[in-house]
Amino acid sequence: MSLSPAIPLRVRDADIASTIGAELVSAEGVGLTLGGRQILVNVDVAVHAGEIVTLIGPNGAGKTSLARLLLGLVKPTAGKVTRASDLRVGYVPQRFPVDATIPIDVRRFLTLGVRVSLPAIRSVLQEVSALHLMDRPIAVLSGGEFQRVCLARALVGMPKLLVLDEPAQALDYAGEMQLYELIGDIRKRRGCGILLISHDLHVVLGASDRVLCINGHVCCEGIPEKVASHPEYARLFGREAGKAVAVYRHRHDHEHDLSGAVKCGDDCGHSHD
């Protein structure tokens, strides 16, 4: 992996900067070496309450490793990580293996390892539009349904920071749009910070306040439109990739149903082609 110097891009949207809250977690100059291989070099990142930060980059770029450093699951070999003293974290990993032979329903899944009241279970399932799944076996859920249930589990502990590793990997395009709208709604309701990890460029950039492009180091960072036009981004993903940011950047005055179809009438003011 080539570790060329990062090209700084620290542009902050004024509206975003005015609404974010206290710093929840930060990394300063962190590096990580595993088995003699450099995974991360001199990375700076911070996540504040009320903002959505996305780590993007190719497979093997160190995105998940950086998230694990921020969560304290591994220790950096250089630099330091600082977490708020009262930080509560909700984490949805990239893979959450569940043995299909074990008869466990959604209600039981949400209580594994934690004590949760039935009203709390109902509340988080309602929040992610999955209350109707409460008594359904985990083994029969679709990919999108299971992602919502995993998100509900992460919300049970009232986290101040929500970390989602490739949350849309099992979803089609319509499902991705629904999920990222839901994530945005959670941020607005709860005021929590959200760290997203993805290598998918089509929707996740438009759902983010700030983006860091990672390839062992921070190639570039800033608001989505600035990152998408950055030469380091184009070098990693191709010059056509920047057009993906515009796909879902506008604010909707319509809703989608569970199939992804638009629920508003013809006068909603948007093109849905």
Which functions belong to the PLM regions below?
Residues M158:
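Conserved catalytic motifs of ABC-family nucleotide-binding domains
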Residues L162-E166:
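Catalytic Walker B motif of ABC-type/P-loop ATPase nucleotide-binding domains
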Residues S198-H199:
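H-loop/switch region of ABC-family ATPase nucleotide-binding domains
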Residues P137-L141, E145:
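Conserved ABC ATPase signature
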Residues L118-M134:
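Conserved ABC ATPase "signature" region
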Residues S229, L236-D273:
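ABC ATPase nucleotide-binding domains
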Residues V211-I223:
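H-loop (His-switch) and adjacent beta-strand-loop-beta switch element
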